[in-house]
Amino acid sequence: MSAHLEADVIVVGSGVAGSLIAWRLAEAKLKVLILDAGPRIDRTEALKLFLAARDKNINAPFPPLPSARATDYYINAGVDIFRGTYMRGVGGSTWHWAGSVLRFRPSDFRMRSRFGVGLDWPISYQQLEPFYDEAEQALGVAGSNTETWGAPRKSHYPMPPIPPTYLDSVVAGVLGPLGMSLGIFPQARNSIFYDERPQCCGSASCVPLCPIGAKYDASVHATKAEQAGARLETDAVVYRLETDDSRRISAVFFRRPDGSAGSAKARIVVLAANAVETPKLLLMSRHDRMPKGVANSSDTVGRYLMSQIDQVTRG
């Protein structure tokens, strides 16, 4: 069965970027269509899967996609150069993110002039600050208005900081004599009731799943977008973009796991399918007039991917 859909704006992906954009546009009374490659995620069912899982890894609460069963074995023919844990599903990978929302510091935008490496950004911290404020209000961020981690503020966080745990106090007591201190990062997690979501109850399972929805995930704004009039199509894997004579994307084509297919047209198409899927889609949509892929005259689409580098310790 084929579907032919039309909208003012198509948003590909319902993660944090796509859902926020869809919400704002739907509130502005535009006809918005959201296409997500994954299913809706039921929090109660996800919690059951997590509790029953022997290996409580980052994707344990979430059902595997039909084409990627967890029981299949993985054939490694060489070095595994990139292994992402991003999700397909309404809300995207914010379902299993930690929720830490540190701002960049002013010096991060002036790497060349300040430190002599890299490049300076074409925008400054001061230009972005109002948008940081807006994002923190939308997501619901709990943080200290005095402990800013080098990023000055003109406005207050919408919620007070998450209180330190007993373990935090023990670690702080050990670090103190060593000349080190312990601080609390700003968190997209409710320290009080906020935006119709409950206060954090301290389950200590932000990764991979908040059992009560106190930690922000983008399904919050996907739902708000729908309430404002947006249409959300799940299990719709976009595989090709069509461009018009002015080289603008005018239509998208998608398939579903059951074999059905469809297309959608709009005046504006927003690609918000994360740093891997978005360039992949642009490159997959190459044609005679755009042999390097859509929006790739620079030949840099899909290059220079930088993942998150961190050290996580659990105990």
Predicted regions: what is each one?
Residues 27, 31-34, 38-51, 227, ...:
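Glycine-rich loop(s) and the adjacent beta-strand/alpha-helix scaffold that form part
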Residues 58-61, 72-74, 112-238:
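Conserved redox-cofactor binding core of oxidoreductases
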Residues 7-34:
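N-terminal Rossmann-like FAD-binding beta1-loop-alpha1 element of flavoenzymes
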Residues 95-116:
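Periplasmic solute-binding protein
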Residues 1-6:
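A short, basic/flexible loop-to-alpha-helix module at the beginning of a structural domain
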Residues 195-197, 244-250:
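A short, glycine/Asx- and small/polar-enriched loop/turn
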Residues 30, 37-99, 125-134, 168-176:
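N-terminal FAD cofactor-binding segment of flavoenzymes
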